């Protein structure tokens, strides 16, 4: 069982770039489809139900599933990172340095939230318009209620998994890590491992950011049709999508 588990772990880490690339293709398709859907909605609100239902299925396959895959990888990555800390390969300070080095969407949010000029505020809104305290709660108002395509210009960068990790550990720490991997008979090198760890944790957060944009827009579209039919938001749980 242990040998089988090691083999699965090795395969997951050594081939993660190809797997992550395929996951990202689904997320990119979802985001592009979201933008196209909003354009259709703005042009023709009457004959829209079929497109809406198709897109809701796409959210499952190209949003929720990719996020779940990244969440699973992030769980493995965090376990590995914790094992390095427990085995004194890295100390708590270095552990935090690795986590703080991640260019997650939260890093972008914090950077933009401090900026003041009109262009930067517009860029902030384009990225984070969809946020609401309860991601899946239709009753809670989001950052901006306007339903617009809001395309992301740097989508590839948000989903990038080629992290600059050479500076994170000292040569002594790298040597200790490679010895630890060899001792545990894992055919993985430091570069591949640390890139997998940082990419997995980063992309868990960034993939959720992508698919919740679609969730948020779907909720706003449902609210639009509910208002058209004088359906109260609190009553929406009693309706199927065909009834709205």
Annotate each predicted stretch with a short phrase.
Residues 1-244:
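Contiguous hydrophobic, helix-prone segments at protein termini
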């Amino acid at each position: 069982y242990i040998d089988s588990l090691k083999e699965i772990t090795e395969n997951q880490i050594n081939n993660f770039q190809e797997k992550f690339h395929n996951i990202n293709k689904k997320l990119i398709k979802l985001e592009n489809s979201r933008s196209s859907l909003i354009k259709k909605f703005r042009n023709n609100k009457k004959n829209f139900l079929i497109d809406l239902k198709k897109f809701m299925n796409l959210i499952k396959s190209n949003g929720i599933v990719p996020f779940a895959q990244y969440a699973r990888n992030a769980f493995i990555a965090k376990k590995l990172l914790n094992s390095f800390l427990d085995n004194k390969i890295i100390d708590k300070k270095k552990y935090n340095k690795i986590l703080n080095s991640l260019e997650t969407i939260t890093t972008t949010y914090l950077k933009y939230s401090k900026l003041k000029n009109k262009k930067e505020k517009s860029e902030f809104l384009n990225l984070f318009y969809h946020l609401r305290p309860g991601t899946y709660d239709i009753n809670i108002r989001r950052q901006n209620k306007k339903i617009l395509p809001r395309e992301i210009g740097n989508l590839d960068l948000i989903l990038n998994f080629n992290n600059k990790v050479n500076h994170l550990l000292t040569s002594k720490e790298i040597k200790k890590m490679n010895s630890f991997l060899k001792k545990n008979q894992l055919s993985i090198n430091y570069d591949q491992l640390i890139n997998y760890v940082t990419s997995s944790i980063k992309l868990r957060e960034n993939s959720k950011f992508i698919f919740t944009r679609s969730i948020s827009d779907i909720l706003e579209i449902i609210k639009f049709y509910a208002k058209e039919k004088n359906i109260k938001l609190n009553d929406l749980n009693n309706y199927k999508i065909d009834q709205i």
